[in-house]
């Protein structure tokens, strides 16, 4: 396939244009009066959302050169979502503004390397000021406020998330799932979460969110590494005959075994996900046993004379109502009352409490307390309902955003919302030292760019951007901001309009990182459009292979 190369000014122009296309689509969702975006799905009704990263990821531009720019800003939205869980729209708006302003400086003939140095100094100073003015989350009401703002002003969502955190603790496990009715409910169920995710991204069942979700799976617990597939064949065939999915938790899975599991998963012969066991050494064995008790299964270990190749039915496998696996975490959920499991869990908790009393190591005590909390506290499930499937999915997106924002707030605290935290933090730049005039240009660019979130929120509310920015510029109160819901100037903290510090910080860092890369780019290589058209007319890959799922491949 031949390539086309675009250089210098034309390259930058195309990239900036592509960034602007995505930023315009994402930016309209910002703030309480931001608009929803309808995203066409490959099947079923369109997805209606205000989630910035969902909007960004749905964009694929026909013009290859423009699409390179689009991918830049999609990457900033994705990175912000991965780190902070929220703030993707703010990051996109800032990145768009920063790229345009930095490009103006280069076009004007200013030394762009010095401009970038000045801008980098400015970003560091602003982030330090934001952190300095951050306040810790003190109570349930502040948690509800963060969740309410992040969910587009939905107070019910804020209160439900605060209630869930109250029941399982601020560091407890909270999941989101569809309700089977119209209601929005909080339910605390048996379950646990540990810090290990899938071994390969090819196990993800939801490619948009990159997670694996299984209903009523079997759980195979192995105290060993698996490299060859043959020992797994009997148990895989037994599970495949039931039609249920399988969660494999082992020391490690690699080589031929991993390849075979991925192949059969993609083929549809068996739904499976492989996860590394949590912990290390003896602690790993204890945690596997914790999971076994919770799921009513057994740990397959040769130390007890149980060989993997001899497991040819599901009797030694655990079960769960639901398992959710991300690249970093695995959550096991039960919502069925089982008195036998309850007794075993209580007995296990008592054993751990005794071990806590006996140990003299602070580190060991901390790890035992973590295990106890995982077994005892359970999992809070936010069950989201809606009158229609479209309404339910839209609300579920907002609940997930709000939950991420709340976690970020618990982690690093909160600052005044509505874009004013960055707006007022930019004042530290007035006294920031610089080495030359070109660096001063970079500092001033960041100062201007930090108005972008406030301007976008006001614009989406139908207000006058310049009037609001001018009014806030006169204020000596760093909590004073513009409430886009009421179109009034208020004390943002007292009004409950707050943002997680981590979200604000991450949005600025990621936006500037991408803007710097764009300005450093002077050429791009893309496929020729004619080649793409030729390929599309040439038929499908593989020339017409047909057939059913068949058996498993080993």
From Swiss-Prot:
One cellular component term from this protein's GO annotations in UniProt: cytoplasm
Catalysed reactions, as listed in the record: ATP + H2O + a folded polypeptide = ADP + phosphate + an unfolded polypeptide
Regions crossing the membrane: none
Superkingdom in the source lineage: Bacteria
Sequence segments annotated as region (Disordered): 528-554
InterPro entries associated with the record: Chaperonin_Cpn60_CS, Cpn60/GroEL, Cpn60/GroEL/TCP-1, GroEL-like_apical_dom_sf, GROEL-like_equatorial_sf, TCP-1-like_intermed_sf
Pfam families linked: Cpn60_TCP1
This protein's record includes keyword ATP-binding: yes
Localization: Cytoplasm
SUPFAM superfamilies recorded: GroEL apical domain-like, GroEL equatorial domain-like, GroEL-intermediate domain like
PANTHER family with a match to the protein in the record: 60 KDA HEAT SHOCK PROTEIN, MITOCHONDRIAL (PTHR45633)
Family to which this protein belongs: Belongs to the chaperonin (HSP60) family.
Alphabetized HAMAP family for the sequence: CH60 (MF_00600)
Protein name: Chaperonin GroEL
